Amino acid sequence: MSSAEALAFDVIVIGGGHAGCEAASAAARAGARTALVTHRFDTIGVMSCNPAIGGLGKGHLVREIDALDGLMGRVADRAGIQFRLLNRRKGPAVRGPRTQADRKLYRLAMQQMITEQENLTVVEGGAADLVCDGERISGVTLADGRVLKCGAVVLTTGTFLNGLIHIGEKRFPAGRMGEKPALGLSERLLSFGFTLGRLKTGTPPRLDGRTIDWQSLDMQSADEEPVPFSLMTDRITTPQIECGITRTTPETHDIIRANLHRSAMYSGSIEGIGPRYCPSVEDKIVKFGDRDGHQIFLEPEGLDDDTVYPNGISTSLPEDVQLEILKTIPGLEKAVLLQPGYAIEYDFIDPRELKRSLETRKVCGLFLAGQINGTTGYEEAGAQGLLAGLNAARRAAGSEPVILQRTEAYIGVMVDDLTSRGVSEPYRMFTSRAEFRLSLRADNADQRLTPLADEVGILSKERRKRYLTRETALSHARMVTQSLSITPNLAGYYDLRLNQDGVRRSAYDLLSYPDINLDRLIAIWPELASIDPVTREALEIEAQYAVYMERQQSDIAVMEREERLLIPSGLDFDAISGLSNELKQKLKQRKPETIAEAQRVDGMTPAAVALLIAQIRKFGGRQKLAAETLEGKGAA
């Protein structure tokens, strides 16, 4: 192989964080010759902030990444040291699988998967510039002068894009603590005409767990039976640990109030907007100062690591103030601070500059994923990375992009929110963002998305086999329970209280009743005892939601019709009579591709949508007439 060939790829992914790893893996699985460009191999898969994966809404994203044969779920299963299913007492649609993770195990597991992936080469070095041929991406220039040629680029810069760390009055350029920022790429993106903004996130101090008074604290245990993220994980084998729980005190709050002027957040040093749902401890005291305390979870960062992450006291106060704060918190009075908490500002691009494939509208072949799009969180980044990497590979191969709809995945909800509405603060996934969350459950992610992964060629043979085995078992169990039925009178004999209407009900129908599960039905039909535990749970959840799903299907059908109604690329929004100038301007700026996207533009009313549809039909008629005229001239 010549040196020129060695530096030529189909897809180049810049950044080795959660978005970058998923993007590189997805592109390589799709058959693209892929390069992952990162400063150092040993930083691939680093958990920059909280050592945890999943949670409410976020756990759904991890399951969807896994259903598409991504990495995060399998890596988290290997590294998880405290698995807990959040919202366990609520319905399955809003339950959130979560685990604390051993930072080292997570990083090493991710690096192993990246190393073992076919078609994927890790290139150590900093990305200095993007190379374009006209309005199409054609390569990446590295800081050492090497030029990598490609057909598509996925940019996953995280907090590195003009990153600036703040600790009280101190501030210095960094991508995260101890690592250099990416300084040249923002200027290149501005030269392309992109709109850049500044966002902020923060992290708490790190503590020496050996100096914490664990005996005085309440402890929280892992679930007795850990539930894995991945279909490919049979059971969790990593030892499980406890974490401690403490609270801030009125004395803590007094110290924070007295030093707000020294906080980078409140001194005016920080321009960027921080995440609403992950506030700094300063924010908590300013906005919720009437509370007598705020909860802190003391999360060990590894099985053989004494570092503890105090979840709940993210801060940009000076180091000396952070030390004073620790002395006022029960159990932390003698805690040794290993690293101060800090805030970090970074550049991001208005995600309305993107298509739903995550390709930029201005530069063909340039895809963005993760915090550069205004999101926060490993899970949001990983999900975007997978979609961007897949579509980058398809762009390089000349194939149509994969678009996930709001009706089929939380990934689709997130991408649609970002590209149609933009962000005014870091975007975090919640189940409440999805209109059809009864359909988009964590437990059925494989059923929703694995067939798609198979169709587009990113599914391994091992996963296909396991998925089909599980689906066959569920299909058989469904068929059996639907074939067995009972009258209300006979059901009463087994202490099942049904409406005495004379209508026979199947075992499947009975599972939709809140107080009836498979254990109770085995007393009537002993053959149901042969259904394995995994299939049993899936069947019970499916039956429980069956009635609601039938009702929701009509709403889904309406949205899918709107998604299919495309807006022609040549449509002149200025020519739509009756549409306000403000809406015309917004439509020209956003360039919605479907009626469903247009409906989510701020200010779009039903009347405005009707005008738009009428213009599309008129445009379609003119296009047809023009084609017929050309055809007639050709015949003459």
Curated annotation (Swiss-Prot):
Binding site for NAD(+): 274-288
Single Gene Ontology BP annotation: tRNA wobble uridine modification
Matching SMART domains: GIDA_assoc_3 (SM01228)
Binding residues for FAD: G15, G16, G17, H18, A19, G20
GO function terms (MF aspect): flavin adenine dinucleotide binding
Cofactor(s) the record lists: FAD
Keywords noted in UniProt: Cytoplasm, FAD, Flavoprotein, NAD, tRNA processing
UniProt subcellular location: Cytoplasm
GO cellular component, one term: cytosol
Physiological role: NAD-binding protein involved in the addition of a carboxymethylaminomethyl (cmnm) group at the wobble position (U34) of certain tRNAs, forming tRNA-cmnm(5)s(2)U34.
Family: Belongs to the MnmG family.
Assembly mode: Homodimer. Heterotetramer of two MnmE and two MnmG subunits.
Matching HAMAP family: MnmG_GidA
Name of the protein described by the UniProt record: tRNA uridine 5-carboxymethylaminomethyl modification enzyme MnmG
Organism, scientific name: Brucella canis (strain ATCC 23365 / NCTC 10854 / RM-666)
Taxonomy of the source species: Bacteria, Pseudomonadati, Pseudomonadota, Alphaproteobacteria, Hyphomicrobiales
